[in-house]
Amino acid sequence: MQDIKQFVESGQIARFPGGIHPPERKQPASEQPLRRVPYADELILPLRQHIGLSGQCTVRVGERVLKGQPLTDAALHQGLPLHAPTSGTVKAIEQRPMSHASGLPEQAIVITPDGEDKWRERQPRPDYQQRDKAELLDIIQAAGVAGLGGAGFPTSQKLAQQKPVSYLIINGVECEPYICADDRLMREHARDIVLGMRILAYITGTDKTLLAIEDNKPEAIDSMRVAIAEYDDIELRIVPTKYPSGGEKQLIQLLTGHEVPSKQLPIEMGIIMQNVGTAFAVKEAVIDDKPLIERVVTLTGECIEQPGNVWSPLGTPVDALLEYAGFKPEQQQRVIMGGPMMGFTLPITAVPVIKTTNCILVPSTRELPPPGDEMACIRCGACAEVCPATLQPQQLQWLAKAKDYPALEENNLFDCIECGACAFVCPSEIPLVHYYRQAKSQMRNQAREQAKAELAKKRFEARQARLEREKEERLERHRKAAEARKQMQQQQAQEASEQPSDNDGKSSAVAAAIARAKAKKAAQEDGSSTPAQPADAEPEQKSKKSAAVAAAIERSKAKKAAQQTARESDVEAESPATEQQRPAQDKSAAVAAAIARAKKKKQAREQQTSDDRASQSPDQEDKQ
């Protein structure tokens, strides 16, 4: 950084590699004063006119709008609002062809001017130094200010860098042939541009501002030198005419003697660059409360009768501008938006002027012949010699045709500024920039799709983690609830055991009475005189009772058997049998013996029945 400071303080101008010197052809358009174009019958305002996202419509079809009224809100990221260039009625919100080489339609707001040109309420702010820097950034963003010298990057986003800024460079080089919009703006509005530069320096906090102008603009140089004379922190740098010395990285190398490293931004070196037209728009936004609703456009080419620079309301159709400038078409006429090096041929002229439109070029075929048929590369190397980014254009072209995007990335395709110097010197008339733009677009699309896929993957993983976390939390809640219920049940059981009920004694007495009644009944059925034992007797007492009953029954049986035997013996002794009576007596004895046996069997069965009942009665008492 010290080397940069020393080089800047020396006032030297360095050189950058490559570059060309095409015919300038800025006259006669640069010699005509600025004019104002009348409002067209309709103004077509695409929702997106800058790098970044488009906003959402805040108006409806049929609604009346005032000049400077916001038509859209700002998008969340790199968004800028759109404003009505004049008062009128919203005619439509529909798809219209856009200012692009493809001519593809995009969403646009169509306004029919009412001729009154009535402004919304405005609040001028001449005391910008009394306001907070963040507030000024909000004002610039709300005014829809985008870079007017390049791709249209939102100015507020560029100024809101969180890194220290050592140098603010204001680009007034305007190196491309034919284009002279910044030249006329510096000639006629030098003090307004300087005010915008002061606001930008205040926001960035830099102590040094460098104003760079190409040496082919002597009138603009004189005008700006007078305007900055009272400011010691603004220095004028006059750079030699060479294309593309107005490129951001090329101009930084000219003024600082150092090249911006590949894949880095100027802010990494402590530098911010803005166009002179952007500085003018910042002044109008902050001090005059005027949003970006118009810009200076160069109308030039041999097929225009009145070439010059005009204040064109944004949304003005190109065909309306051509009619105003006296357009006289010829066969196979080309209408180019931009310059001959970086511009593109419009497929139709019913497309609008947008924030990044700086020139409408209508050349004759003699003045600017159309490109011839593409031929094979002869490997002459001329394209590499003029490349200001020190790339290998022919190698990039082969890789772009092969769609070898990783190799294009390795060969620094995105360092290409699409200046067109390589195509300008190509003897085979290969549209090299066309291939680079296509490859860049496809690579950006791939990067966007990959970013979407990565985002979707992260969302899925986050969702799965959330579901798993919720499941674990749910299970933990259930576990804690079960433990709480278990503890509650144990506590209730403990409390119940510590506080017995009055009914417990009554229930025990009733159960004992029922048991005694059952035991008594069982004893009666068995014919036993053994008193019934209480139901709550021990198992050993019950067993002794059963054994006593069985022993008594056995003694009774033995006694009866002995008595029966004695009776039979007495009968035989009292009645001695004769020889003749013995058969009859034997027969009677056999009958008596059979009867006795039958009685014994009957008694045995009855005794067995009684024993069974006696044995069942204690079991039933135990169960009860």
Ranges and model annotations:
Residues 357-371, 384, 388-501:
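Ferredoxin-type iron-sulfur electron-transfer modules in oxidoreductases and energy-metabolism complexes
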Residues 1-58, 110:
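N-terminal, Lys/Arg-enriched amphipathic/low-complexity engagement segments
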Residues 88-90:
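Conserved hydrophobic positions within beta-strands
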Residues 92, 97-148:
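Acidic low-complexity segments
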Residues 60-73, 92:
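Short, well-structured beta-strand-loop connectors
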Residues 499-624:
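Charge-dense, low-complexity intrinsically disordered regions
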Residues 117-119, 147, 168-182, 303:
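Gly-rich Lys/Arg/Thr-decorated short loops/hinges at beta-loop-alpha junctions or inter-strand turns
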Residues 207-314, 318, 326-328:
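Hydrophobic alpha-helical positions that pack around
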